[in-house]
């Protein structure tokens, strides 16, 4: 089986590529920048140029492809409206998959996206899912909460650097998952017929609030942190401002997404059925506590070694 991965350089995409290669799949990666994607080629993947903003560049990537895994999304620095990638590009991708008679199309949505039509990113995801379901292309939609990896920059690093952690005062619990575990479940689903044309959650358990994550990071790092709260009213005001400027549309969309964090609704879902269908033991999926424990353990050891080496150098200079 040959897989085509879109968004292969991203946080989730690269883990999917690595897992697929480890499982013996042939992997093609549709990329915009061949130089920046060179590490994927070193792993054993084939790189093919393609850009979701240019539909005519997509179809050439589909030769010999059995299944598509689309892990792509627009980024804040991109100088165009997110709709260009997250809707138009996705529709072009699905149409190309249909023309190429691809056997399976895997797409990633966001938990509860159908409940927030006024939030651009959620609305775009819902529109793509709707189009995919009506396309006659066999699909799997995985609904995500968030990834452990994103919590490192948001909480762990500021705490280690003794800087303030910025939060929105949200009470929304989110079920995060390690991208390596997510990739394992995604690749596993390719060989399970009962996942066909299903929308399945892809989350960890339990769900965590910002306050709980900060408390855990403080415990594991042995450091207290200063918490700075961003008023939701300020986010709404910034959203209105950024929405008036074309080059800040993507920022406006992300600010709209941030507003829902104050809703209090849980971004989680039961995973029992998914584990059962895929034949996965839930104990194989790493918990946030263990993930952060391993992270802080490694970082604190490195810091300790650096401090020791600096102390030795100071002693030599003094002598």
Curated annotation (Swiss-Prot):
Q: Where is this chain primarily localised?
A: plastid
Gene Ontology CC entries for this record: chloroplast; photosystem II
Q: Which GO terms describe its biological process?
A: photosynthesis
EC code: 1.-.-.-
List the Gene3D superfamilies hit by this protein, alphabetically: NAD(P)-binding Rossmann-like Domain
Its source organism is Pyropia yezoensis
Q: Which UniProt keywords apply?
A: Chloroplast, Oxidoreductase, Photosynthesis, Photosystem II, Plastid
Spell out the family assignment given in the record's similarity comment. Belongs to the NmrA-type oxidoreductase family. Ycf39 subfamily.
Q: What is this protein called?
A: Photosystem II assembly factor Ycf39
Q: Where in the cell is it found?
A: Plastid, Chloroplast
Source organism phylogeny: Eukaryota, Rhodophyta, Bangiophyceae, Bangiales, Bangiaceae
Source taxon at top rank? Eukaryota
**Could you cite one Gene Ontology molecular function of this protein?**
oxidoreductase activity
Cysteine pairings via disulfide bonds: none
Q: What class of enzyme is it?
A: oxidoreductase
Q: What does this protein do?
A: Involved in assembly of photosystem II.
């Amino acid at each position: 089986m040959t897989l085509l991965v879109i968004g292969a350089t991203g946080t989730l995409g690269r883990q999917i590529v690595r897992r697929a290669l480890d499982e013996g799949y042939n992997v093609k990666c549709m990329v915009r920048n061949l130089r920046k994607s060179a590490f994927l080629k070193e792993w054993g993947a084939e790189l093919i140029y393609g850009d979701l903003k240019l539909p005519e560049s997509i179809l050439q990537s589909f030769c010999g492809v059995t299944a598509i895994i689309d892990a792509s999304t627009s980024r804040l620095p991109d100088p165009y409206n997110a709709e260009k990638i997250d809707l138009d590009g996705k529709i072009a991708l699905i149409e190309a998959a249909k023309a190429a008679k691809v056997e399976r199309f895997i797409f990633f949505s966001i938990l509860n996206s159908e409940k927030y039509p006024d939030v651009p990113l959620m609305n775009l995801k819902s529109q793509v899912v709707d189009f995919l379901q009506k396309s006659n292309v066999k699909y799997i939609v995985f609904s995500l909460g968030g990834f452990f990896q994103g919590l490192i920059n948001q909480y762990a690093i500021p705490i280690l650097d003794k800087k303030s952690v910025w939060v929105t005062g949200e009470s929304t619990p989110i079920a995060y998952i390690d991208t390596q575990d997510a990739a394992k479940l995604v690749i596993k689903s390719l060989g399970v017929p009962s996942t066909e044309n299903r929308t399945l959650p892809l989350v960890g358990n339990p769900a965590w609030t910002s306050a709980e994550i900060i408390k855990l990071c403080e415990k594991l790092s042995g450091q207290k942190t200063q918490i700075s709260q961003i008023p939701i009213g300020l986010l709404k005001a910034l959203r209105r401002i950024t929405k008036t400027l074309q080059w800040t549309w993507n920022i406006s969309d992300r600010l709209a997404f941030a507003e829902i964090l104050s809703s209090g609704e849980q971004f989680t879902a039961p995973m029992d059925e998914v584990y059962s269908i895929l034949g996965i033991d839930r104990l194989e999926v790493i918990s946030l506590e263990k993930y952060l424990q391993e992270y802080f353990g490694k970082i604190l050891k490195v810091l300790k070694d650096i401090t020791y080496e600096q102390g030795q150098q100071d002693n030599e200079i003094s002598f």
